[in-house]
Swiss-Prot record:
Family annotation (SUPFAM superfamilies): Prismane protein-like (SSF56821)
EC class name: oxidoreductase
Source species taxonomy: Bacteria, Pseudomonadati, Pseudomonadota, Betaproteobacteria, Burkholderiales
TM ranges: none
Residues that coordinate or bind hybrid [4Fe-2O-2S] cluster: H252, E276, C320, C407, C435, C460, E494, K496
GO CC annotation: cytoplasm
Protein name as catalogued: Hydroxylamine reductase
Cysteine disulfide links: none
Natural source organism: Burkholderia vietnamiensis (strain G4 / LMG 22486) (Burkholderia cepacia (strain R1808))
């Protein structure tokens, strides 16, 4: 096992990374190795998928499988080794089906079919020991002694960014939104990685290409969310419980939540959101369900405490799951790409078992005094009052904007984001997105001339909204985004955040502060390139960084 894809990776050894029997995320070495092998297998599908496109052949089910398989390998998504064995078998069958279609097309047209090598020629071993032996040769650090840490780190940057792209594309796909150019870009990147690239410039350009592709994917997901559920609207969300039977929904998948709301209508069961599901309350088609009563708990890393105290069943719809404690192991369910050994997995939006569990559990005995927070400041809401915002800037009422967002986590140093937000002067506006918001979203920030000082833009994928807001302001002031009174203070944890970071870099956005630590796969040599080209810098002291951001604007 070797893995350093997330922020919580082990950094105590000579080389950062989890390389023991169990990673810091809870992933055991068998699962980690099978995930490495699944990525290898998916590269083989992509090699034939890319070839098939040149021959006019399409296999949409193969495209979709690539998204799903990649999603299962993200941090805190799937820990179920047996499911990865099954996915490996399915990957080989999928690859062979695409290859057979290429063969048939070549015969029909008289074209010569090239003999693809590497992952395209891989065949799964017959048993688990054999699969693990195969995995040992294809891990993320394969070739380290030959090509060096910089090349391995750049390959990891591309792969991890690609995982985030696939996750966002999967979210859009399950809502009925997909595009062939997105599948083509994803499979081209996987096929590129299948060649074991060693050219620094080619790797950096591929990373930026993925950033551009991810912008397209986030735009598609934005269209999917708004197309299915309406544009986000500023909405008050209850954060105190209501008496009655209850189900808690965590993760990111709005489609799963909608299906559950439909199935629980009229049952007397109240539904609560958790973690990154909080923005669901801002979508009209979801907020219209009266039994979507509120949000419970905090960010993903608080789930063991939150879930233990919740008096009903829990549904995990996507990342991020942590090892379930005995207090709730029998009442947590997974769906979609999520998995944990011994936890019941629900398929095809059939939540009848979950609903029966809710009816059998006590629920909340009493209604607590009402407490609310406000969400729903996506691009439609903010750009709808753009004139008011622009006038406030011109009048000197708004001096600066801060985007303080991204993934939260349990590592020391994340209080920085709370301190930064709390210390932001009263004439500044804080935009936030992702679960990092839980560090300060219950604080009273007030408003500036009726404009809330804290604007919750949405989930991590709503970085697209934040980008649209920033570019609209730049257009209004006839300047570039880097010339705006805007600072990006980003908290990263996993591969979706890596994809968003690549998008920001591809857009030429500079001087991003990133923390709480820099990615372990970003070697000093690669970091020098990112600093030189993009001005990326690690977070430091909140007060000093805040002063530097404001002084940069003044200068």
């Amino acid at each position: 096992m070797f893995c350093y894809q997330c922020e919580q990776t082990d950094r105590t050894g000579a080389r950062p990374g989890c390389a023991t029997a169990k990673g810091n995320c809870g992933k055991d070495e068998t699962t980690a190795d099978l995930q490495d092998l699944l990525i290898h297998a998916v590269k083989g599908i992509a090699q034939y998928g890319a070839l098939a496109r040149t021959m006019g052949v399409r296999d949409r089910e193969a495209d979709r499988f690539v998204l799903y398989a990649m999603f299962t390998t993200l941090t805190n998504v799937n820990f179920h080794a047996a499911r990865f064995v099954a996915l490996l078998r399915e990957a080989a069958q999928t690859r062979d089906r695409v290859k057979a279609a290429c063969d048939a097309q070549a015969r029909a047209t008289g074209a010569a079919l090239p003999a693809l090598q590497g992952p395209a020629a891989w065949q799964p071993a017959d048993d688990l020991p054999g699969l693990l032996k195969q995995a040992a040769a294809v891990g993320i650090d394969a070739g380290l002694d030959t090509v060096g840490a910089d090349i391995v780190g750049l390959r990891a940057l591309v792969l991890y960014g690609l995982k985030g792209v696939c996750a966002y594309a999967h979210h859009a796909r399950v809502l009925g939104y997909e595009r062939d150019d997105i599948y083509e870009g994803i499979e081209a990147a996987l096929a590129f990685l299948a060649t074991d690239p060693t050219d620094v410039n080619a790797l950096l350009e591929q990373a930026l290409d993925l950033g551009r592709l991810n912008l397209t994917v986030m735009e598609l997901l934005d269209s999917a969310n708004t197309g299915r559920f309406g544009a986000q609207q500023p909405s008050a969300v209850r954060v105190s419980p209501v008496a009655g039977k209850a189900i808690l929904v965590s993760g990111h998948d709005l489609g799963d939540l909608h299906a559950l709301l439909e199935q629980t209508a009229g049952t007397g069961i109240n539904v609560y959101t958790h973690g990154e599901m909080l923005p669901a309350h801002a979508y009209p088609a979801l907020n219209a369900f009266p039994h979507l009563v509120g949000n419970y708990g905090g960010a993903w890393q608080d789930q063991q405490s939150d879930f233990a105290h919740f008096p009903g069943p829990i549904l995990m719809t996507s990342n991020c799951i942590i090892e379930p404690l005995p207090q709730y192991r029998q009442r947590i369910f997974t769906t979609g790409p999520v998995g944990w050994p011994g936890v019941r997995h629900l398929e095809h939006h059939d939540f009848s078992t979950l609903i029966r569990a809710a009816q059998a559990l006590p629920g909340f005995p009493a209604t607590a005094p009402e407490e609310t927070i406000t969400v729903g400041f996506g691009r439609h809401a903010v750009l709808g009052v753009a004139d008011k915002v622009i006038d406030a800037v011109k009048a000197g009422q708004i001096r600066h904007f801060f985007l303080i967002g991204g993934c939260d986590g349990a590592a020391p140093g994340r209080n920085y984001y709370t301190e930064f937000a709390e210390q932001a002067p009263d004439d500044t506006v804080v935009m936030t997105l992702g679960c990092n918001k839980y560090r300060f979203n219950r604080h009273a920030f007030g408003d500036i001339g009726g404009i809330p000082r804290l604007l919750d833009v949405g989930q991590c994928n709503d970085s697209y909204s934040a980008i649209r807001i920033a570019t609209a302001l730049a257009d209004a002031f006839e300047c570039g985004v880097n010339d705006l009174p805007l600072s990006l203070v980003i908290s990263w944890f996993e591969q979706k955040a890596a994809a968003v970071l690549l998008t920001l870099l591809a857009l030429g956005i500079r001087n991003i502060r990133l923390g709480p630590t820099l990615p372990a796969f970003i070697t000093p040599g690669v970091l020098n390139v990112l600093v030189d080209q993009f001005g990326i810098q690690p977070i430091g002291d909140a007060s000093a960084d805040l002063a530097a951001a404001l002084s940069r604007q003044a200068a």
